[in-house]
Amino acid sequence: MLRFSLALTKGDFALQAEAPKPCQRLALMGPSGVGKSTLLSALAGFEGQAQGTVHLGGQTLAAGKTGLAPESRRLGMVFQRPLLFPHLTAEENLRFARPPTPPPVTFEEVVARLDLGPVLPRRAHQLSGGEAQRVALGRAVLAAPSWLLLDEPFSNLDPARREAALCLIDEVVERQGLTLVLATHRLEEAVSLCDHLVSLREQNGVSTGTAQPLAQALGGAQAPTLISGMLQEARGTLEFCYGGQALRVKAAPFLREKDRAGPAAALIDPQDVHALPAGAPAPLGCPRFEGQRQGADQLRYGEDVFTLPVPLGPGDESVAFTLLGATVLPPRRRDALAVAER
C-alpha cells in the first residue's frame, strides 16, 4: 500500500501531489507536460529536489536527497523510453534482474506472455520501440519488486501485445500483492489496472492532484470524459452509453472472444473516435463501422443518433468510424465501469 505527500519545484515547473489514504493500484493521469513522469520519478527517488514523504507498506521513504536511494527501494520501473543495456541481448537484459527472492513469474512465462522468443538473441540497440518496451516490462516483473512504477508502458505496443502485457501486469500485481503506480493518458488502461486515480491539473502555474478512489474520480466534475460500453451477448451488440444516449454496434469478434466467462465491458476515450471518409481503410486491428455523419459531432448508425463529446472534424457525409482503445475489463473492475456510465 502506498501513501505520499510530495512537492517539487524545478525552474518554472512546480508540482504538488498527494495520496492521503493507502492505495495499492494508482493511476496518474493528466495532459502532456502536467508532471506525470516527474511525479513517478519523485516516487522512485530520482528527483533530488523533491520534498515530502513516501510511505510504502510499513516503510517511510523520505523524498529528495535524504531519501532512500532508488536501488534500495525494491522497485521495478519502466520508463516512457525504455532503458536497456544497449550491447546486451534481449535475453541478457531480462536475466540481468537477479532478485533476492523468486520472481512472481518464471523467465519462460514472461517470454511466452510477451512474445519475446524471436527477439531474445538480438542486442537491445537492434530492437524496435515496441520490442524494447516489452523487454523492459519483462525485466521489471522478473526483478521481483515490491512495487511497479510504469510510465506509459504500453504506448508502443500493437493491440494484441498491449492486451497481453496488460493482463500479465494485472495478474502479477494481484498474485503478489504488489503496489502499482501507472502514468498514462489512456483512460482504459487506468480503469483496467488501477483502483485509485490522481488527475493532475495545472492551476495558477502549479500542477496539483490528489488521489481518489477510481469510481469517485470518474464521477467527479474533473473526470475525463468517457464513453463506456457493455457487450450484450444475447443480442450480439456492443452498447456504448454517454449522456443518456446509446450507440449499438455489432460486437467485434475480438471483444466476444476475450471474456468467455460472462459479459464483457469496454471503455473508449472520445479522443480515440475517428471519422474516416467512406472507403478509407481502418487502422490495423480496429473494428470499423459504417455510419452517417450529421453535423460536426453527430453520428447516425442504424436507428441511433449519437452526439459525441468531441467534434469529428472535416469529412464526408457517409463515414466509417473506428473505436480505438476499446478494452475488456476484468470482471472485478466492472463495478467501476457501472459507476462511470453517464
Predicted regions and their residues:
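Catalytic Walker B motif of ABC-type/P-loop ATPase nucleotide-binding domains
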Residues: 148-152
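Internal alpha/beta loop-helix hairpins
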Residues: 170, 174, 184-245
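Glycine/charge-rich catalytic "coupling/switch" loops of P-loop NTPases
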Residues: 244-288, 311-342
